[in-house]
């Protein structure tokens, strides 16, 4: 049994790219400046891989950008929600369709609706882009739960990560993908869902439906440097980092 202090000299992160790209690097730098405790590797292999890395002792922290299952909760002693992500549904910036309902999204992502003309758009085939369905990505699972009701995805073009999906949609007038709003770039537009725009205010007000927790997990009860970092992540300074692109936990 590893003690919590095992990783004290080299804190490491593996897991969701949403957390690993947009939060951990800046938070780790500030934490190191304040405490002298530095991070080693910061990975982005996805939520499932990060969870396994934490449970197997290969990473101090696993990052999961979705709700934990009951089985997962039983495997970890430490879990801290550091914020909430706004999930966006992105289309090409020139597409005239600006809003859809969750029921309409289900028709599209299940493969039952395959042309934008069904949604008052142009007569143009719909191409769904997604991170790899079998890759253990939090976005894939969260969207499947919140929009598809855990039914299977229809035909999709599978890519390695959210950045790739967004890049393809920016170049494809018929493309659509689900991803964290933190990955938004010029050339794409995020749809309003159920009449609510994907803004932090709409999530905080409860009108925008696609919201998910950002969680750091540890196998053992955190102590030493691990506990210090988790405590730090809930301080105003760290929550300000979270708040740049996400909804802070505090």
Regions found by a protein language model. Give the residues of each.
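Exported/periplasmic ABC-transporter solute-binding proteins
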Residues: 1-250
């Amino acid at each position: 049994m590893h003690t919590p202090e095992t990783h004290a000299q080299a804190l490491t992160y593996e897991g969701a790219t949403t957390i690993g790209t947009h939060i951990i690097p800046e938070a780790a730098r500030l934490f190191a400046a304040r405490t002298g405790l530095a991070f080693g590797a910061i990975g982005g292999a996805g939520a499932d891989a990060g969870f396994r890395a934490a449970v197997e002792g290969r990473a101090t922290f696993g990052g999961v950008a979705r709700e934990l299952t009951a089985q997962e909760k039983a495997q970890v002693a430490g879990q801290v929600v550091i914020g909430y992500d706004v999930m966006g549904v992105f289309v090409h910036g020139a597409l005239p369709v600006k809003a859809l309902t969750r029921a309409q999204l289900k028709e599209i992502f299940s493969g039952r609706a395959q042309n934008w003309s069904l949604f008052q758009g142009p007569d143009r085939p719909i191409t769904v882009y997604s991170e790899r369905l079998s890759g253990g990505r939090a976005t894939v699972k969260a969207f499947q739960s919140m929009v598809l009701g855990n039914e299977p995805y229809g035909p999709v073009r599978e890519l390695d990560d959210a950045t790739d999906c967004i890049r393809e949609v920016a170049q494809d007038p018929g493309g659509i993908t689900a991803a964290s709003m933190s990955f938004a770039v010029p050339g794409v537009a995020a749809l309003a869902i159920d009449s609510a725009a994907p803004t932090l205010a709409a999530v905080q007000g409860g009108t925008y439906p696609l919201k998910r927790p950002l969680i750091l997990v540890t196998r053992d009860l955190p102590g030493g440097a691990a506990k210090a970092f988790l405590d730090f992540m809930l301080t105003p300074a760290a929550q300000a980092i979270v708040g740049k692109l996400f909804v802070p936990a505090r």
